[in-house]
Amino acid sequence: MIKIDHVTYRYDEEHTALKDISLEINKGEMLAIVGHNGSGKSTLAKHLNALLLPTEGRVEVDGMDTAVEANTLNIRKKVGMVFQNPDNQIVTTIVEEDVAFGPENLGVPPEEIRRRVNEALKAVGMEAYARSAPHMLSGGQKQRIAIAGMLAMEPEVLVLDEATAMLDPQGRREVLDIVGRLNRERGMTVVMITQYMEEALSADRVIVMADGRLIAQGTPREVFSRGRELRANGLDLPPIAMLRDKLIDGGMNIPADVITAEELAEAICPLK
């Protein structure tokens, strides 16, 4: 659905943020892109709906080249983005009006806008707050409203660019639960950009970036079994994977691909 072909991006002559990235994002996939600050993951995210254009290489969304200006509107209809700070995406003083803002700008008929707003608020569990003021909501609730605003545009792909970074643990869980449900129940393609490795455990595939390059990819189990390699690139592991590696280093015979608490407990129990 999205094809990234040998993409390099330079902010200026001295700063190359992406270095020869090639990647395909499949329809209906839950993809996590992880890396430390400055790894290039957010720069890559902004290429997915033509907010940034490659210095070299090519990005296609359903066959549409993002560098062709005539394609921009259709690409942004297909690929919606939710950013780190929900306050930057909330533009009105009433929740339902904010969710309606995008469809209104697309010229969607009023009856269709009402349907989309109702469905979007229901999808994120915020229908009871339709007439509320966004500034009175918690961070997690605001981010759910930002997601609802994207859903009302009816995109095929939802990109979350560190959308949980400013939230407390409860807010993060709320957002991740909603995104997971959209992927499972609606078949929506989801791309999660995150520095929280545990968030990537729910993905179908994990992409690891460092210094503007793609350095690893695979299922969460495949990627997070490579603990030493990831740590060598300055990356953390999910807490269970970190504990697993410490136990292995301490001499315990535990499979290197254990990534959940249940699996770790099952591996440890026979050793007692």
How would you name each of these model-derived features?
Residues 34-36:
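The feature captures the beta-strand-to-loop junction immediately N-terminal to the Walker
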Residues 49:
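Helix-to-loop junction immediately C-terminal to a conserved catalytic motif
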Residues 58-74:
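ABC ATPase NBD Q-loop/coupling interface
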Residues 111-129:
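Conserved ABC ATPase "signature" region
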Residues 133-137, 141:
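Conserved ABC ATPase signature
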Residues 158-161:
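Catalytic Walker B motif of ABC-type/P-loop ATPase nucleotide-binding domains
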